[in-house]
């Protein structure tokens, strides 16, 4: 695992966040990516719905580069997904008329997220996107990277 301000973060760093969601009854699937880079397996989510046939509403999400890859995947799978969660990430793909529910969050003190790019690419999200700026939050705040 590299430090919190670089890519290639182990997927298990996001387990505590997903655990909190799971405690609320939300099925969360944490996918291991080759070399801890979502860009190396852009279709990793393809086989997941068939493993959980009882689930009817599917969201995909990710943090940073993983979020950008999730957005790219969502743009190509709008008929199969219900929503997208972007954590310190933005979408370069046009999702404006996708019908997806989108939630985007980042920290007010995020020194890694390219804010100019984030703002410029907000045009790619549906008008009803929900956005949260976490006061005092930083880029690494979405994961548990260890000491």
Which residues make up each language-model segment?
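Short beta-strand/loop motif that positions the catalytic acidic residue
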Residues: 98, 104-106
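Active-site-adjacent alpha-helix of alpha/beta-hydrolase-fold enzymes
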Residues: 22, 106-147
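Short, surface-exposed "cap/lid" segments of acyl-processing enzymes
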Residues: 1-22
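Active-site nucleophile loop of the alpha/beta-hydrolase fold
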Residues: 33-34, 85-93, 107-111, 136-137
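Conserved acidic catalytic loop of the alpha/beta-hydrolase fold
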Residues: 43-58
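Gly/Ala-rich beta-loop-alpha elbow adjacent to hydrolase catalytic centers
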Residues: 61-70
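Conserved alpha/beta-hydrolase
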Residues: 18-38
């Amino acid at each position: 695992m590299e430090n919190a301000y670089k890519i290639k973060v182990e997927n298990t760093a996001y387990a505590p966040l997903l655990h909190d969601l799971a405690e609320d009854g939300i099925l969360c699937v944490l996918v291991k990516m080759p070399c801890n880079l979502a860009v190396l397996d852009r279709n990793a989510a393809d086989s997941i719905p068939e493993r959980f046939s009882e689930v009817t509403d599917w969201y995909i999400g990710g943090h940073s580069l993983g979020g950008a890859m999730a957005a790219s995947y969502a743009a190509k799978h709008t008929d199969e997904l219900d929503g997208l969660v972007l954590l310190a990430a933005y979408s370069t793909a046009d999702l404006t008329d996708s019908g997806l529910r989108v939630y985007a969050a980042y920290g007010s003190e995020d020194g890694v997220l390219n804010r100019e790019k984030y703002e410029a690419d907000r045009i790619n999200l549906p008008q009803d996107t929900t956005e949260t700026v976490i006061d005092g939050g930083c880029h690494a705040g979405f994961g548990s990277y260890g000491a």
